[in-house]
Amino acid sequence: MFKENTIKLGIAPIAWTNDDMPELGAENTFEQCISEMALAGFNGSEVGNKYPRNTVVLKKSLELRNLEIASAWFSTFLTTKPLEETVEEFIKHRDFLHDMGAKVIVVSEQGHSIQGLMDVPLFKNKPVFTEEEWNKLADGLHHLGKLAQEKGLHIVYHHHMGTGVQTTAEIEKLMDITDSALVSLLFDTGHLVFSGEEPLYILKKYLPRIKHVHLKDIRQEVVDIVKENELSFLQAVKNGAFTVPGDGVIEFDEVFTILANSDYQGWFVVEAEQDPALANPFEYALKAREFIREKAGL
């Protein structure tokens, strides 16, 4: 289905240890995490909170297991803080990823975000940007995009539950007000369906701008409980709203077909944060790998 050597398969460490809730998977070590990724048949990983920041140490650990770094999350605060603060941290992050051989930097605006707040209802309190904030976001992303390209990288914007860029309309707004040469899009199946969006619409409309893909599934019965009981994003994660592709309600066949017939080259990263005490990360990594092999021929 996919052209040879166009797709690399990664998996996010958040299934082993959760950066937002460190108590989830606190017992799982960095070495266990990356060893199980490799054993499950993946080529790479994004970066978690237990990963060494020393690139020499990290490279050695990954090379022993034939793994690479696909990318790493970067929180921007372009709508709420001076640009200089974000830029200073971004340059360090960019240089780290450049040293690790990554080609994309995952960015997500966290100004006014509720994704990290345990007791704030997700669907009732989602932030909505003002026009001034949209302009600050676009200008800031253009600046970061140029900084990324100085080292041969691209920024990919991660639409995300509980943030100001979550819905179809918000993604469209962001794409409309940003330069496609500087700001690319991360396509995340799980966050789109969780929000009630139509992922194929976003995929088809912005295919040329998509430079990174997160494969994530959802358990609809848990999402329904999140809405009914007015739970937060973190409570949704703890209750099992997300799971690996093939274990939830999302249909991936057409997603894979569209991407296979496109010029997309890069990573597919399985990202499914759930409680590792309830969903064994290695078992679920194997499930995801088998599903991708079966459905995408990869």
UniProtKB/Swiss-Prot annotation:
InterPro entries: IolE, IolE/MocC, IolE/XylAMocC-like, Xyl_isomerase-like_sf, Xyl_isomerase-like_TIM-brl. GO terms for molecular function: manganese ion binding; myo-inosose-2 dehydratase activity. Keywords: Cobalt, Lyase, Manganese. Its EC number is 4.2.1.44. Pathway: Polyol metabolism; myo-inositol degradation into acetyl-CoA; acetyl-CoA from myo-inositol: step 2/7. It catalyses: scyllo-inosose = 3D-3,5/4-trihydroxycyclohexane-1,2-dione + H2O. It holds the Pfam family AP_endonuc_2. Its cofactor is glutathione; Co(2+); Mn(2+). Gene3D superfamilies: Divalent-metal-dependent TIM barrel enzymes (3.20.20.150). One of its GO terms (biological process) is inositol catabolic process. Belongs to the IolE/MocC family. PANTHER family: HYDROXYPYRUVATE ISOMERASE (PTHR12110), INOSOSE DEHYDRATASE (PTHR12110:SF41). This is Inosose dehydratase. The gene is iolE.
